[in-house]
């Protein structure tokens, strides 16, 4: 009888935990289309008409893509992948490229859609990446692309709380 009572008690406790876990609703911050557009326009204006700018939301979906008048066609994919790399690793794509240049973490470079090139910057609220921006095609190279991406984020910094 005591074994049966213990079994019933354990099942009741497990049932209480599982039903309360299902009842929780996640609340996540994400980048709005207006914020994404402001970041992209600012980054494009800071750089040159030759760049492409991609802004992704927290799930890696493209929110905004701007291609400058003189941008090369391949810059769309490069900008998106730089932004994706920054988003998924929550650091600039240049920092990630340095970190994965050799050693045990070098294998991360073979993951789909990541790219070891600078020009991608995460959009952070505390420790959470709510989006990212990536640029490609700046005549000053990856350092200029990163600076332009950061200028775009700086434009909305007061809203990132």
Task: Describe these PLM feature segments.
Residues 6-17:
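Bacterial N-terminal signal peptides
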Residues 1-5:
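Positively charged n-region of N-terminal signal peptides that target proteins for export
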Residues 22-161:
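Flexible, solvent-exposed loop/hinge segments and secondary-structure transition points
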């Amino acid at each position: 009888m005591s074994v049966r009572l213990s079994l019933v008690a354990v099942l009741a406790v497990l049932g209480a935990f599982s039903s309360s876990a299902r009842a929780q609703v996640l609340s996540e911050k994400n980048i709005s289309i207006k914020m994404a557009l402001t970041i992209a326009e600012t980054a494009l204006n800071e750089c040159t008409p030759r760049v492409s700018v991609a802004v992704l939301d927290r799930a890696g979906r493209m929110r905004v893509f701007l291609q400058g008048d003189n941008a090369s066609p391949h810059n769309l994919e490069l900008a998106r992948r730089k932004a994706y790399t920054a988003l998924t690793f929550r650091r600039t794509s240049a920092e990630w490229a340095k970190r994965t240049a050799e050693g045990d973490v070098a294998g991360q470079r073979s993951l789909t859609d990541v790219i070891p090139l600078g020009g991608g910057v995460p959009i952070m609220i505390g420790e959470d990446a709510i989006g990212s921006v990536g640029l490609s095609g700046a005549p000053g190279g990856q350092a200029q692309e990163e600076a332009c991406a950061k200028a775009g984020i700086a434009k909305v910094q007061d809203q990132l709380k």
